[in-house]
């Protein structure tokens, strides 16, 4: 589960849980096929649809001595499961 970072709990994502849709942030370099494979393999569920978008806020700049770097950019995935399947709640990232 290297590509999946953490579950997202917002008003919209909690509302989508009623439609059997789960929201999580993933690494921007991960493909849809990889994410689908990881979720089906790890949780034992069937994925029927996946929607994704890049978060509008770019990675925050961070200085490391004379070099300027940036934090990782993330992509948000909304994963729709077949009826009858569910994912146990993932651990929420503390900020």
Curated annotation (Swiss-Prot):
Q: Which residues form a coiled coil?
A: none
Recorded hits in Gene3D superfamilies, A to Z, give:
3.30.70.330
Which PROSITE patterns does the record associate with it?
RIBOSOMAL_L23
Keywords tagged on the record: Chloroplast, Plastid, Ribonucleoprotein, Ribosomal protein, RNA-binding, rRNA-binding
Which processes are annotated in GO (biological process)?
A: translation
| Record-linked InterPro entries | Nucleotide-bd_a/b_plait_sf (IPR012677), Ribosomal_uL23-like (IPR013025), Ribosomal_uL23/eL15/eS24_sf (IPR012678), Ribosomal_uL23_CS (IPR001014)
* TM region(s), chain numbering: none
Recorded GO terms, molecular function?
A: rRNA binding; structural constituent of ribosome
Q: Which GO terms describe its cellular component?
A: chloroplast; cytosolic large ribosomal subunit
**Where found in the cell?**
Plastid, Chloroplast
Q: Which Pfam families match?
A: Ribosomal_L23
Q: Which SUPFAM superfamilies match?
A: Ribosomal proteins S24e, L23 and L15e (SSF54189)
Give the quaternary structure.
Part of the 50S ribosomal subunit.
Function, in words:
Binds to 23S rRNA.
The family this protein is said to belong to: Belongs to the universal ribosomal protein uL23 family.
The protein's name: Large ribosomal subunit protein uL23cz/uL23cy
- Tell me which species this is from: Amborella trichopoda
């Amino acid at each position: 589960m290297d590509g999946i970072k953490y579950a997202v709990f917002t008003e919209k994502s909690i509302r989508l849980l009623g439609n059997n849709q789960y929201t999580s942030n993933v690494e921007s370099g991960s493909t849809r096929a990889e994410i689908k494979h990881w979720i089906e393999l790890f949780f034992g569920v069937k994925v029927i649809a996946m929607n994704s978008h890049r978060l509008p806020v770019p990675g925050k700049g961070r200085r490391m001595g004379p070099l300027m770097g940036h934090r990782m950019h993330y992509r948000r995935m909304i994963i729709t499961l077949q009826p009858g399947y569910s994912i146990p709640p993932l651990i929420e990232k503390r900020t």
